[in-house]
């Protein structure tokens, strides 16, 4: 190899996956994580791969973009996806994890590789040599400034908001009922808090008028739709959230035998099901207001909070115009990975960490970089994030809106069309992987 040492900055999802993949390819890796010496507004621990928002890695359905991404990552050998499966908790058709167990599994994978050196402490200057910056959306101000000097231009900022987590033993199970949407009562992975029209309207009034924690520096920022605070959604219209996080479709309140006017779903945070998060209720309300407002929800009147919702600033670069097709800063030994690239989502962060490792390895052995088929979930996302023609770049999840249309001209239902996208993607990926044994097979010389 032309070089065999790499510094990875950031011990989140992208950085952890990247470090493990590099180590498995013979590199000496220095994995730098600023916590616990320096924390962030959203982190609660000093563990690697801490999940700071939801504990869900989204759908596993093969006809969904999120499910397709997981299938692609499995074929590409993602270690963190395997950790997620081993830490999974019941969540219907989604892959949700016990966040503590997940971090423990990732740390065990890192510790099992003696060529990874974990260094705790803030990185304030980008080191010499080959570097992968996976500092995440909560990149420290000092390092953010260094990144901006490196790529030129200004960072873009948006907000993420995390949902509250409650103690299940303090919930009123005579009111809450267990059911996943469209499934039999009592057999679902979610708890549901039903509201009638009067309860819903009172709750929305309280939610939209409650005191918020909004710092002056945060004002005027963009709220990313996928993690928008519930109170902001509710402000767009009195029924907006009833057609979103509080939609009652597919649910039946066993007390009435009818569909409730609205409902809040709660999803298990751990395998023991002692803690539940309020699905879709990321919030920036003050802690006191969160307690007051959520205690208005039937079944949650006496709920005790393991964690209140928080809101934090995210930073990402204008990737299409400052990075190349491998997420490298042209003319440097630096690559970016994870949400700092503007690819949004847990599995997307894992994926870009994997790609950073693969492309760094390809560079070291003098091989071509990874060029995933654009018909795939990850290939389409990379294309969007690195195409200079992309205008008004904003954070993006994998979604089928990024993939090229089917070419056979057949009319299909939405589900059949998505399944056809997935089938096409996996066929193309399998064919591509077969052409790259240097990166994905046993031949890594």
Outline where the language-model segments fall:
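Internal hydrophobic alpha-helix adjacent to the cofactor/substrate pocket in enzyme cavities
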Residues: 350-370
């Amino acid at each position: 190899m032309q070089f065999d040492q790499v510094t990875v900055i950031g011990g989140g999802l992208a950085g952890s996956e990247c470090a493990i993949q590099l180590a498995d390819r013979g590199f000496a890796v220095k994995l730098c994580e600023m916590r616990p010496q320096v924390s962030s507004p959203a982190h609660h621990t000093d563990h690697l791969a801490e999940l700071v928002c939801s504990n869900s890695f989204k759908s596993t359905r093969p006809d969904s973009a999120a499910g397709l991404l997981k299938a692609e990552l499995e074929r590409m050998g993602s270690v963190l996806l395997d950790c997620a499966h081993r830490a999974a908790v019941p969540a219907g058709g989604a892959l949700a994890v016990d966040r503590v167990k997940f971090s423990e599994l990732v740390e065990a994978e890192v510790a099992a590789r003696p060529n990874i050196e974990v260094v705790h402490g803030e990185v304030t200057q980008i080191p010499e040599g080959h570097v992968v910056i996976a500092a995440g959306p909560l990149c420290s101000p000092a390092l953010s400034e260094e990144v901006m000097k490196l790529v030129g231009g200004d960072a873009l900022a948006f907000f993420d908001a995390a949902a509250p987590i409650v103690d299940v033993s303090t919930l009123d199970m005579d009111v809450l009922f267990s059911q996943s949407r469209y499934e039999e009562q009592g057999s679902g992975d979610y708890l549901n808090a039903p509201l009638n029209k009067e309860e819903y309207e009172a709750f929305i009034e309280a939610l939209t008028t409650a005191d918020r924690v909004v710092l002056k520096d945060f004002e005027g920022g963009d709220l990313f739709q996928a993690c928008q605070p519930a109170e902001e959604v509710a402000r767009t219209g009195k029924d907006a959230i009833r057609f979103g996080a509080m939609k009652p479709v597919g649910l039946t309140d066993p007390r009435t035998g009818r569909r409730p006017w609205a409902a809040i779903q709660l999803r298990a945070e751990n395998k023991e099901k002692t803690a539940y998060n309020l699905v879709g209720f990321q919030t920036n309300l003050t802690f006191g207001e969160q307690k007051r407002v959520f205690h208005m929800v039937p079944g949650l009147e006496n709920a005790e909070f393991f964690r209140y919702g928080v809101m934090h600033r995210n930073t990402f670069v204008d990737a299409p115009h400052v990075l190349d097709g491998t997420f490298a800063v042209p003319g440097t030994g630096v690559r970016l990975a994870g949400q700092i690239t503007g690819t949004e989502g847990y599995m997307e962060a894992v994926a870009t960490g994997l790609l950073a490792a693969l492309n760094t390895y390809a560079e070291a052995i003098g091989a071509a970089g990874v060029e995933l088929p654009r018909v795939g979930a990850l290939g389409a996302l990379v294309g969007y994030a690195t195409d200079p023609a992309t205008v008004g770049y904003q954070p993006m999840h994998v979604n089928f809106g990024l993939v090229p249309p089917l070419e056979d001209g057949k009319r299909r239902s939405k589900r059949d069309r998505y399944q056809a996208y997935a089938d096409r993607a996996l066929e193309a990926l399998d064919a591509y992987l077969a052409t790259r044994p240097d990166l994905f097979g046993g031949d890594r010389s």
